[in-house]
A protein has these predicted regions:
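Helix-hairpin-helix
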Residues: 1, 26-27, 34, 117-119
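Acidic, metal-coordinating catalytic segment for phosphate/diphosphate chemistry
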Residues: 2-5, 50-164
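Active-site nucleotide-donor binding segment shared across nucleotidyl transfer reactions
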Residues: 11-50
Length: 164
């Protein structure tokens, strides 16, 4: 699907989820400004006790296409919304930055970041569970993507620059 159409659909989904979320961001290839989009990735922090309501809202969006909503406490997948899959990743304040970074991609960029993290004594958790000091097995408090790049000794890259 072309990016312009995907952005419109992503914004439709986000408008449904906005009342239920403290914070959200459209991620993936849309955020990287790729011309073609295979799916819609959204990262959100639900308001207190709103996870079930988010799933219910996605199920309402799924009905016209007889699509399904699957997943659990950290990830929900809407199999089809007007012809495109929607993946909703559930974060909290501690996992927001790494989950947004990882779900923005690209896959090759994430691999390079994970390699760099290991080189400097960290583990960048692909599931978005944070940046971990390997020697102490403790998460590093990072709240922005910029902080993650800084911890890894790298200059920040805008999402559109994260293709490898």
């Amino acid at each position: 699907m072309n990016r312009a159409d995907a952005v419109i659909l992503a914004e439709d989904v986000v408008s449904e989820l906005t009342p239920l979320c403290e914070k959200f961001e459209i991620a993936g290839s849309i955020r990287r400004e790729r011309p073609l989009v295979n799916d819609i990735d959204i990262v959100c922090i639900p308001k207190f006790l709103q996870l079930d309501a988010i799933k219910e809202r996605l199920e309402l969006l799924a009905k016209p296409a007889r699509a399904t909503v699957t997943g659990g406490d950290r990830y929900l997948k809407l199999s089809s919304f007007k012809g495109i899959q929607v993946d909703v990743y559930i974060a909290d304040a501690q996992t927001w930055a790494t989950l947004l970074l990882v779900r923005t991609g690209s896959k090759q960029h994430n691999i390079k970041l994970a390699q760099r993290a290991r080189e400097v004594g960290y583990k960048l958790n692909a599931d978005g569970h944070g940046l971990t000091w390997i020697s102490k097995d403790v998460n590093v408090p990072v709240h922005t993507e910029e902080q993650i790049f800084k911890e890894l000794g790298l200059a920040y890259k805008e999402p559109r620059e994260r293709e490898v």
